[in-house]
A protein has these predicted regions:
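C-terminal structural segments of small proteins and small subunits
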Residues: 57-89
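Residue-level signal for inorganic ion chemistry
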Residues: 5, 33, 69
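Eukaryote-biased recognition of intrinsically disordered, low-complexity regulatory segments
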Residues: 1-19
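Short secondary-structure boundary/capping segments
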Residues: 12, 44-45, 63-64
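Compact, glycine-rich, soluble single-domain proteins
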Residues: 17-48, 52-55
């Protein structure tokens, strides 16, 4: 079966693409998709324990089973900001 993989931010930079199509065996999980990407793009492996995943635009666990035609998005950890809230009065 085939899934569309979407990568964001640093993950996109490391893979050199924001969208990929990959074959996954029947019964495969989001983690299987990720492991295939990490094998193809070894620099992604460093993010394995920190990524978030969404299947068909709903956050999911890496253990979620994916199906033919699914959209599987991987997002790196979010960081940044000044640490101070801006209430719009400045």
């Amino acid at each position: 079966m085939r899934v569309t993989v979407r990568l964001f931010a640093r993950l996109r930079e490391l893979a050199g693409a924001s969208e990929l199509v990959r074959d996954v065996p029947d019964g495969g999980t989001a983690l299987d998709v990720w492991n295939g990407l990490a094998e193809e793009f070894p620099a992604l492996a460093a993010y394995t324990k920190a990524i978030s995943v969404a299947v068909n635009e709903d956050y999911a666990r890496l253990t979620a089973i994916v199906h033919d035609g699914d959209d599987v998005a991987f997002l790196p950890p979010v960081s940044g900001g000044s640490g101070a809230a801006n209430d719009g009065n400045e």
